[in-house]
């Protein structure tokens, strides 16, 4: 037992000694100067900045869209690579393609940059001619367009504007077109040698006419769409004549209306000694001239309206024109009776005006009331003459009563 206890105590002592020895031998870092501490801190900050930049670059590369790579690769590939035909096309004859049928659409349009610029008028004429040709020649195929070039200078200039700017592969009748949209070219394309030689042999002997497509296109546009002609002066003269003929009877009627209104005003002013107004027949103010067997509706309505305005009575003589009731030939009978009554009334009115014109008229309220009553009397008498469709308009009466400023009614 004693031996075991001694051994345990010995082991504990040895362990404690080892721990103390390690603590004494551990290196202690002491910075004697402050500059060394600041430099150490700056180094740590620089390392942290570098790590942050590297982390940011890693995130940018992870979320990249590939735009930078595409931009860097533009110098290696052609910008018009998407327009090139997939299959290699064999070189055909000179008239079966503009440049052998081996160029793309974009390059073929750029190859014409050496042409001289044209004026705006020529461009407008070419566009008009091309639109007219497209509307008339949509059903034509490309084979007919190219085969018709050898027919003559007229057909050559016509077919020159219908060229299709697409790559074609001609093997007998088989064709493989990569694009299904046909582009109608409205530019000046260089004509082949065969066409230019045939076009130069025109009857006039000038080769420039066969080579200049704008002139031929402009001429064709004029043929397809002729210029508008100015309207002849005969139409204006005829319209003026018709207006004069139409308004001539109305002017005559207006002149007659003025004369009759003056006569009616003079007749109303004349009053006898007893203070009673003279009795005028209703038909004395009505005047019908040039009665036709079947008068037109427009002239009849105008005469009736003029008669209603000519009469001094303030109620309507005849109804307004209505589209429901057509013109009846039986109205001539009533017009004839009005004409007879008008002649009799004028004669009696003239005789009375000559005999009594000395006394001034009265303008009192009683005189106006008696005048209105006397105006209503012939209204009742004449209502028996007209047919039933005219009665509703005859029952209306309008009397004008002037109000004096001294007394209020």
From Swiss-Prot:
This is Uncharacterized protein C16orf46 homolog. InterPro entries: DUF4529 (IPR027836). PANTHER family: CHROMOSOME 16 OPEN READING FRAME 46. One of its GO terms (cellular component) is nucleoplasm. The lineage of its organism: Eukaryota, Metazoa, Chordata, Craniata, Vertebrata. Residues 134-160 have a biased composition (Polar residues). Pfam families: DUF4529. Residues 12-32, 133-160, 194-213 are annotated as: Disordered. Signal peptide: none annotated.
């Amino acid at each position: 037992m004693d031996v075991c206890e001694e051994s345990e105590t010995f082991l504990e002592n040895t362990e404690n000694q080892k721990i103390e020895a390690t603590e004494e031998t551990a290196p202690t870092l002491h910075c004697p100067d402050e500059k060394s501490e600041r430099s150490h801190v700056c180094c740590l900050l620089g390392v942290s900045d570098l790590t942050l930049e590297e982390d940011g670059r890693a995130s940018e590369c992870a979320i990249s869209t590939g735009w930078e790579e595409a931009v860097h690769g533009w110098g290696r590939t052609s910008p018009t690579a998407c327009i090139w035909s997939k299959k290699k096309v064999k070189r055909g004859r000179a008239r079966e393609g503009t440049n052998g049928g081996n160029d793309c659409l974009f390059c073929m349009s750029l190859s014409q940059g050496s042409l001289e610029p044209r004026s705006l008028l020529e461009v407008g004429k070419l566009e008009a001619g091309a639109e007219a040709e497209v509307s008339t020649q949509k059903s034509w195929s490309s084979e007919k367009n190219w085969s018709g070039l050898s027919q003559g200078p007229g057909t050559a200039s016509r077919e020159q504007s219908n060229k299709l700017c697409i790559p074609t592969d001609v093997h007998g009748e088989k064709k493989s077109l990569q694009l299904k949209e046909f582009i109608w070219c409205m530019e000046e394309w260089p004509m082949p040698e065969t066409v230019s030689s045939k076009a130069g042999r025109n009857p006039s002997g000038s080769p420039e006419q066969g080579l200049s497509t704008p002139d031929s296109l402009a001429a064709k546009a004029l043929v397809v769409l002729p210029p508008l002609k100015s309207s002849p002066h005969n139409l204006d003269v005829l319209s003026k004549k018709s207006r004069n003929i139409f308004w001539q009877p109305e002017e005559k009627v207006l002149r007659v209306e003025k004369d009759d209104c003056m006569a009616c005003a003079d007749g109303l002013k004349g009053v006898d000694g007893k203070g009673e107004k003279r009795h005028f027949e209703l038909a004395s103010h009505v005047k019908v001239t040039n009665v036709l067997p079947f008068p037109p509706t427009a002239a009849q309505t105008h005469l009736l309206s003029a008669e209603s305005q000519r009469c001094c009575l303030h109620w309507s003589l005849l109804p307004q024109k209505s589209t429901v009731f057509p013109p009846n030939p039986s109205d001539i009978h009533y017009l004839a009776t009005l004409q007879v009554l008008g002649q009799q009334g004028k004669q009696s009115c003239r005789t009375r005006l000559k005999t009594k014109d000395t006394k001034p008229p009265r303008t009192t309220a009683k005189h106006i009331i008696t005048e209105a009553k006397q105006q209503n009397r012939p209204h009742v008498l004449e209502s028996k003459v007209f047919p039933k469709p005219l009665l509703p308009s005859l029952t209306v009466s309008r009397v004008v009563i002037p109000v004096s400023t001294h007394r209020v009614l």
